[in-house]
């Protein structure tokens, strides 16, 4: 039975030791976190006025990369948005930007005004464009729910893992020789398997480096759209649905083959 032990956790970061799982399962979770978690991101911009030096296309591109808070519990499932089972307006949020510079001014992400208080820029101090006196920007931006497999602006988090290293130091001098690579040679959270193997090249037979095939150090870091716990729960929901859909399709195909044979 797979087991996870949390080593470090903050609202936006989690590190855990996973035991008793196949690499394929751990990697599947990693891939879902990276490319399939749904988040809100600006996808369409209507520019009413832009007298700044920045092209409309570049301005829209910058707005698209501004991370937005995403209250998953208050939004439809991403699958319903993608298949049209819900009204598109339920998966879309409008944001406004109207700035008339009375003096030199930098426009920040925090200047975007959302029609929903729970969908706003995660970080208010992202610079978008600089205006000089007399210049203005008026636009409407429409954010929608999407996934990173379509575009990186919808990426919610990063995730990775490595095999849990088993390190045995036969010569204490190795710790000093490898301190620039691993400050704590025998600490699996400080010294990853790859770093330990680099030390093995330095120390030779004085250092034994092995790994546990079914034990991993796994970490997740959220970009702030939602916390890391929400990211993991959503990743497991999506992965579970993939398994369920696969079994359903396989059962239907198997049933049709039996009927054809009869």
Curated annotation (Swiss-Prot):
Which GO MF term does the entry hold, naming one? DNA binding
Q: Does the keyword Metal-binding apply?
A: no
User: Where is this gene product found?
Assistant: Cytoplasm
| Known EC number | 2.7.7.6
Q: Determine if Cytoplasm is one of this entry's keywords.
A: yes
Gene3D superfamilies of this UniProt entry? 3.30.70.3110, DNA-directed RNA polymerase, insert domain, RNA polymerase, RBP11-like subunit
Record keywords, A-Z:
Cytoplasm, DNA-directed RNA polymerase, Nucleotidyltransferase, Transcription, Transferase
**Single GO biological process annotation from the record:** DNA-templated transcription
Which Pfam family, any one, appears in the UniProt record?
RNA_pol_L
- Cellular component per GO? cytoplasm; DNA-directed RNA polymerase complex
Annotated signal sequence is none
Catalytic activity reads: RNA(n) + a ribonucleoside 5'-triphosphate = RNA(n+1) + diphosphate
Say which family it is in. Belongs to the archaeal Rpo3/eukaryotic RPB3 RNA polymerase subunit family.
Subunit arrangement?
Part of the RNA polymerase complex.
Q: Which PANTHER family match?
A: DNA-DIRECTED RNA POLYMERASE (PTHR11800), DNA-DIRECTED RNA POLYMERASE II SUBUNIT RPB3 (PTHR11800:SF2)
Q: What is the recorded function of this protein according to its Swiss-Prot or TrEMBL entry?
A: DNA-dependent RNA polymerase (RNAP) catalyzes the transcription of DNA into RNA using the four ribonucleoside triphosphates as substrates.
Q: What is this protein called?
A: DNA-directed RNA polymerase subunit Rpo3
Species for this entry: Pyrobaculum islandicum (strain DSM 4184 / JCM 9189 / GEO3)
Q: What is the lineage of its organism?
A: Archaea, Thermoproteota, Thermoprotei, Thermoproteales, Thermoproteaceae
**This protein's encoding gene:** rpo3
């Amino acid at each position: 039975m797979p087991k996870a032990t949390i080593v470090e956790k903050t609202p936006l970061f989690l590190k855990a030791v996973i035991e008793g799982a196949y690499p394929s399962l751990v990697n599947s979770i990693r891939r879902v976190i990276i490319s399939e978690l749904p988040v809100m991101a600006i996808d369409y911009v209507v520019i009413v006025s832009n007298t700044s030096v920045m092209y409309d296309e570049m301005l829209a591109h910058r707005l698209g990369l501004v991370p937005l808070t995403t209250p998953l519990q208050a939004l439809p499932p991403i699958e319903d948005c993608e298949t049209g089972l819900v009204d598109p307006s339920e998966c879309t949020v409008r944001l406004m930007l109207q700035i008339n510079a009375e003096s030199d001014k930098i426009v920040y992400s925090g200047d975007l005004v959302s029609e929903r208080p729970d969908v706003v820029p995660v970080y208010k101090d992202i610079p978008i464009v600089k205006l000089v006196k007399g210049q203005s920007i008026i636009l409407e931006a429409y954010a929608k729910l999407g996934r990173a497999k379509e575009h990186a602006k919808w990426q919610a988090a990063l995730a990775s893992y490595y095999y849990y290293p088993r390190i045995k130091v036969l010569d204490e001098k190795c710790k000093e020789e490898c301190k620039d690579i691993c400050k704590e040679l025998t600490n699996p959270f400080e010294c990853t398997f790859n770093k330990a193997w680099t030390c093995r090249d330095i120390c030779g037979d004085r250092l034994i480096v092995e790994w546990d095939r079914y034990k991993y150090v796994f970490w997740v870091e959220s970009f702030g759209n939602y916390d890391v716990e929400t990211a993991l729960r959503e990743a497991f929901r999506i992965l579970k649905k993939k398994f369920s859909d696969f079994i359903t399709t396989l059962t239907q195909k198997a049933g049709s083959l039996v009927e054809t044979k009869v």
